[in-house]
Amino acid sequence: MLEFKESPEPDEFAREKGRKLFAGNVDFLKGVVDMNGLPPADRLEVCFAGRSNVGKSSLINAVTGRKSIARASNTPGRTQEINFFKTEDHHYLVDLPGYGFANAPIDVVKKWQQLLTSYLSGRSSLRRAFVLIDIRHGIKKIDEEIMDLL
């Protein structure tokens, strides 16, 4: 069983920084299919990871107040690239492909799973990863494996 540390209550400065992270303009920068395509590691990055169709893209749309900045779908495997969004305060929000079941050819799925693993375990500018869990299914072994990469 995973143990989770309880985070201290954020102070007012941290709360305001968190609010500003998502409150300003956010623009799509690029989608990448291999590590060579990543943008320069010149900004801090916050990524959203989780199983296929857990709501990563929808959450990005919700926190940025933009209905479709991140393309969401009811079809598992819709996000097949690592998508980078620039924030006004010089961060990247990163929408990752889902892991687990996807409606795509197996060789394509394997390629983006390798990309996901490489990104999570080796991106120097990655500062926060929000791992979304589907409450209907709970934490699966693959979720634990992803968390271990962090």
Spans of model-derived segments:
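Conserved G1/Walker A P-loop phosphate-binding module
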Residues: M1-N103, D107
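Conserved C-terminal guanine-recognition region of P-loop GTPase G domains, centered on the G4
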Residues: H91, K110-L150
